[in-house]
Amino acid sequence: MLSIRRSLTLAKEPKDLFLFLCNLRARCVSTDDYDPPFSPLSKPTKPPKEKKKQKTKKQDQSSELVNDLKIPVISDLPFDFRYSYSETNPEIEPIGFREPKRFSPFGPGRLDRKWTGTTALASPEIDQSQWVEERARVLGETLTEDEVTELIERYRHSDCTRQINLGKGGVTHNMIDDIHNHWKKAEAVRIKCLGVPTLDMDNICFHLEEKSGGKIVYRNINILVLYRGRNYDPKSRPIIPLMLWKPHPPIYPRLVKNVADGLEFEETKEMRNRGLHSPALMKLTRNGVYVNVVGRVREEFETEEIVRLDCTHVGMSDCKRIGVKLKEMVPCVPILFKDEQIILWRGKRTGEEELVTL
């Protein structure tokens, strides 16, 4: 009796009681699949062999994709590849280059066309009439008025997710690929134009339609909506090799001569001083919309001989781009670029032209 009582009293001690409960819990744990919350049992993990198999499959797929790439890339597009289609004039030949011609922006040996320093010439064997027929087939029947209004209402607003911003580079080569990428999931693309290219919106519309194969269904100041066509198939889109970097611009002849054509040195100097002290016709902003600049300059030349454009904060590079475009479109003669000011001279007029203006 005394021994039994001693064992009970010993069992009532806290240390022995804790060990007794732990042993009892270990005996009561079942081997069933039931896994209550906060249990020490961990979920079964996948065997490592399966993970290795998945990795090998992914590596095989990536190797197949690499092997499928054909280098050099062969493109059937009938036009010459340039960095910018709307902001360069192929008729004006450069007088020098800032980098060797062998450095093609498409990468070494990645294109079947020869790089001349400014363009990648298309093959003369490409049939342009076939490209025109294919474009007409993709566009299909003309859209009805209801379809056009519905399409415009979806893509003309500023919150449209399918938008491409067109900057001072104009219609660039890689932009054509961006347009086709948007056309995979959308019928049209909203294009917002800013900067120097907005001086000639007709030129932008022409190159967008010609190079992409689409059709512009909406045009409002500097906003365009480019439609892909009824029969457009993303799987049969044209092959457009990308430019890996922006090529250095070549060296062109000087835009402003020391002595303007038809004038003497003293006369050009006097006109430059008059232009700097004359009131500015317009004040242009950086990356602005210059749609009405050409018309305003033409109207001013009907009464004035010299026009000054205030291009403060625009940048000298953009000032020269503006001068080049105005020289061709107005037409006029740029005689000075100084302190972000553009001085334009209308040129010498004949007697018949003066009578018409009067």
Curated annotation (Swiss-Prot):
Domain CRM: 141-239, 261-357
Domain of life: Eukaryota
Keyword Mitochondrion set for record: yes
GO molecular function: RNA binding
UniProt cross-references to InterPro entries, sorted A to Z: CAF1P_plant (IPR044599), RNA-binding_CRM (IPR001890), YhbY-like_sf (IPR035920)
PANTHER family assigned: CRS2-ASSOCIATED FACTOR 1, CHLOROPLASTIC (PTHR46247), CRS2-ASSOCIATED FACTOR 2, MITOCHONDRIAL (PTHR46247:SF4)
Name of this protein: CRS2-associated factor 2, mitochondrial
Organism: Arabidopsis thaliana
Any one annotated GO CC term: ribonucleoprotein complex
SMART domains: CRS1_YhbY
One record GO biological process: Group II intron splicing
Subunit composition and interactions: Part of large ribonucleo-protein complexes that include group IIB introns.
Stretches for region Disordered: 35-64
Compartments it resides in: Mitochondrion
Task performed by this protein: May be involved in the splicing of group IIB introns in mitochondria.
Keywords for the protein's UniProt record, in alphabetical order: Mitochondrion, mRNA processing, mRNA splicing, Repeat, Ribonucleoprotein, RNA-binding, Transit peptide
Pfam families in alphabetical order: CRS1_YhbY
Span of chain positions assigned to the transit peptide in the UniProt entry: 1-28
